[in-house]
Structures are given as C-alpha cells and as structure tokens.
Swiss-Prot record:
Record keywords: Disulfide bond, Membrane, Phosphoprotein, Transmembrane, Transmembrane helix, Viral envelope protein, Virion
Transmembrane segments: 56-76, 146-166
Function description: Envelope protein which participates in virus morphogenesis. Needed for an early step in viral crescent membrane formation by interacting with D13 scaffold protein. Its interaction with D13 scaffold protein leads to the formation of rigid, crescent-shaped membranes that assemble around the cytoplasmic virus factory. Membrane anchor for the protein A27. A17-A27 virus envelope protein might be involved in fusion or attachment, and can further associate to A26.
Protein's UniProt keywords contain Electron transport: no
Membrane topology, as annotated: Multi-pass membrane protein
GO CC annotations, alphabetized: membrane; viral envelope; virion membrane
Subcellular localization, as worded in the UniProt entry: Virion membrane
Protein name: Virion membrane protein A17 precursor homolog
Length: 198
C-alpha cells in the first residue's frame, strides 16, 4: 500500500527499550534496512511504471511467461526478427535453456528438413555442458556472460543459415537462369514474322 503508516512514521526511532537504550542501539543499520520500508517510497519514490517493471523482473513466473511468448514469436518469424526475439527473451531466462528449447521446437516444426541438424546438435550439446558447468562449479559472472554471448552468436549463425542468406542467394539465381533459358528477342521476332505470313 502507498499510504502505509511506516512510510512516514518510524515506530522504532521513538521506542524506548528500557534503561535508556534507544532503538538505534539495538539494531544495526543493515538490520533496519532489512525490515523497514525505503525512504520516499510513499512520497513518489517509484511511479507506477517503475513499480510495474520492478514487479515483472522480480516475479519468475511472469519472466518465464514473457520469455515463452517471445520464443513462440521467434519460432514463427523470419531470421532477423527471430534473432531479436531470442535476444529479448534471453533477458528473462537463462540462455542455454532458451537455446535448447528453440532448437528442439525448430526441429519439430521443420522435421523433414534435416540440412542443419549438425549445428542444432552442437548448440544443444554446448548448452547442456554450460548448464552442467554452472550448476556444479562456481563460474564467474563475466565468464558465464561470455559463454552466453558465444552461444547466441552460434545461434544467430544457425538462424541465418536456415532462414536468411541461403534463400536470398538461391532465389535470384533461379530467376536469372529462367531469364537466360527463355527465348531471345530475335526468336520472338522470327516467330511473329512467320505468323504474319499466314
């Protein structure tokens, strides 16, 4: 509640514990901060948007839901948008678990197409090793972020291989081959002349 009594009146500051001992002598500053509200919370310390954002970040179920929604969008979109959705969902859930879920979902979606299964298996194995290392040993945050970045780069390469550059190169070459194999303008002119004689 915004209009909490403790937001503007600290009971413990005027509490007399007996024998002249005040509250500040009973509790350290860290102990007070652990159970007393932050100063300025009721006087505009957080506005509605900041409080909503703070609640979303602190609740794991909401973070998982947002990541799941963005993962579904990533599976059903093209390469660049899929990569953006993957990076956004990596803010809310661990990157290795996200990569494993994306690779499995993409393989189930494109089950008959087995051209890029090797990269997918490599990504899932690297993600599983990363999960094992982070759960069994103490890895620094910097090293873990570096592993996450490497996994995301490999995933970006995988997504571009499936959706992006291969199709963009193959489509113009087919059109060019069709144009080259078609009848020339001289052949069209000769065909018109032969029909005009009749």
């Amino acid at each position: 509640m915004d209009n909490n009594y403790l937001n503007y009146y600290n009971v413990f500051e005027e509490f007399d514990a007996g024998a002249g001992i005040k509250e500040k002598e009973l509790f350290t500053e860290e102990q007070q901060l652990s159970f007393l509200p932050k100063k300025g919370l009721g006087n505009g310390g957080f506005d509605g948007v900041e409080r909503l954002y703070s609640n979303i970040i602190n609740n794991n179920d909401i973070k998982s839901l947002l990541a799941l929604i963005m993962l579904v969008f990533a599976i059903n979109t093209n390469s660049l948008v899929a990569l953006i959705f993957i990076i956004l969902s990596a803010i809310f859930v661990p990157v290795p678990a996200l990569i494993i879920a994306y690779c499995i979902a993409l393989h189930l979606k494109n089950g008959s197409d087995a051209t890029h299964v090797g990269i997918s298996i490599l990504l899932m194995l690297a993600s599983a090793v990363t999960i094992y290392l982070t759960s069994t040993s103490k890895i620094s945050k910097g090293f873990k972020r570096a592993i996450d970045v490497v996994l995301l780069v490999i995933l970006g390469f995988y997504i571009v291989k499936i959706y992006g550059i291969d199709r963009q190169i193959s489509i113009p070459s087919r059109r060019y081959c069709r144009q080259m194999s078609g009848p020339s303008s001289l052949e069209n002119l000769n065909a018109f002349q032969t029909h005009s004689n009749y």
